[in-house]
């Protein structure tokens, strides 16, 4: 199957959250919003029941991977979980009984891309606490996908989380860790490795010949020459100097409080920030409904909506599919770039 003809693989996400209903809504808007063909990996009967409960006229079709594109025009293609597991969920009430199905859906999506049956992975939101209660050993989606991409017995690749929108793109250097741990984790090596991956993927996947990067400071005023913390002076500044010596266009560390206004944003393509919230607050303020989470550094394309499970509104029919639609469209765009096909899966190399 030609790469342009392959569907996207959309995961189930937490079935008690808004993932299933925004998938249904995205399919309904496929013509109006230019949604590319995708297959959802889950339980067809659960999706049918969800559509019925929400009063949505969405036909659901159980498919094989090769049938998804043809079926997409007339029904939502749902690929059953490989184990045949069934899903039962109450909106807004996460249940550890569904943890196995959630993880299986993610694994199956990666396997579809691995086999060439899908062009990219798009993940619906999960609740990490649901999975950790049953022994899930990864901090989040991003780290689990990196483990799935690793060659057997090898270290997984370093995954880099980029939040992208038309207005702003940001990368948190540290991701799902407590704030008090950041100064110890924020090493010069981590900053340099992260920036190199961002630079490489902006060239290969986004088609930017000379990406412009900027690095936010960790402390107020980027440390004020060491008077408000030494990390900016002793860790971030040397990392920037080393990266510039390699030919990477990066500036910083710069004060975070003046890095995200309109004139500042015009001077760079992606902003790197030391902490999770430094990066995510500005993009969720500017593009809450349109932001997309893109995982860089993997041997396949992965995107996801820039929001969580939203248990508080699940099942009420008010969840917006905008970010999921943006994630689906961006995944297709990135997967169609020829440069994406030059790095095979490690297991196939």
Name every feature range the model reports, one short phrase each:
Residues 38, 142, 159-160, 168-171:
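Small-molecule pocket liners
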Residues 163-192:
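Ligand-binding beta-strand-loop-alpha-helix segment within the catalytic cores
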Residues 1-143, 185, 189-274, 278-301, ...:
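Contiguous, glycine/small-aliphatic-enriched amphipathic segments in soluble metabolic enzymes
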Residues 54-55, 149-153, 177, 206:
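A broad structural signal for alpha-helix termini and local helix breaks/kinks
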Residues 147-160, 164-168, 296-312:
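Short, flexible loop segments at boundaries between secondary-structure elements
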